[in-house]
């Protein structure tokens, strides 16, 4: 569980799946979160350090250069990897996205990987699609995002809330 100070109180900003299953949510007071977490070694709480996150994401982007020369961090927790023209070096797009996913898993990260002809479609499918690995064929973008929630449009929270009503 990662926390930060907000108006003289500690609140949860991120939590692992284990803490989420226990009922811990972002924005919750740390005292409330602790009451939901059994006193076991898995219950680890520390102060969130966004600077460390940014440095780690940059380092991860550097490691991903083995897949493409065009890699950029997508803060707070993603990478853009432009694979245009690199598929043949990896024996196909399917093998390439599986290699990216496998590399992230070996480094201890969960990864959702999507390939599409546009960045917006790839981002939406990676973040909200039903599968952890996805290839959207050219011309199938509308079909791929049709059933995704409004949040997949990468709009401001206010705009997304308005559209969701």
Locations of the language-model features?
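Short, charged/polar, Gly/Pro-enriched secondary-structure boundary elements
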Residues: 86-91, 131-135
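Residues that scaffold, gate, or flank divalent-cation-dependent active/transport sites
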Residues: 1-80, 85-87, 95-102, 111, ...
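Compact, charge-rich alpha-helical regulatory domains located at protein termini
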Residues: 38, 126-165
């Amino acid at each position: 569980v990662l926390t930060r100070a907000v108006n003289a109180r500690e609140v949860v900003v991120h939590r692992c799946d284990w803490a989420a299953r226990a009922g811990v949510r972002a924005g919750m007071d740390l005292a409330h979160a602790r009451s939901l977490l059994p006193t076991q070694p898995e219950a680890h709480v520390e102060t969130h350090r966004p600077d460390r996150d940014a440095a780690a994401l940059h380092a991860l982007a550097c490691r991903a250069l083995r897949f493409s020369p065009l890699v950029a961090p997508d803060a707070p927790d993603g990478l853009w990897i432009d694979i245009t023209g690199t598929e043949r070096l990896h024996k196909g797009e399917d093998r390439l996205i599986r290699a990216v996913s496998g590399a992230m898993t070996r480094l201890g990260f969960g990864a959702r990987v999507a390939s599409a002809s546009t960045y917006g479609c790839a981002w939406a499918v990676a973040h909200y699609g039903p599968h952890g690995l996805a290839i959207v064929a050219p011309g199938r973008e509308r079909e791929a995002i049709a059933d995704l929630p409004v949040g997949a449009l990468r709009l401001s929270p206010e705009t997304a809330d308005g559209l969701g009503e």
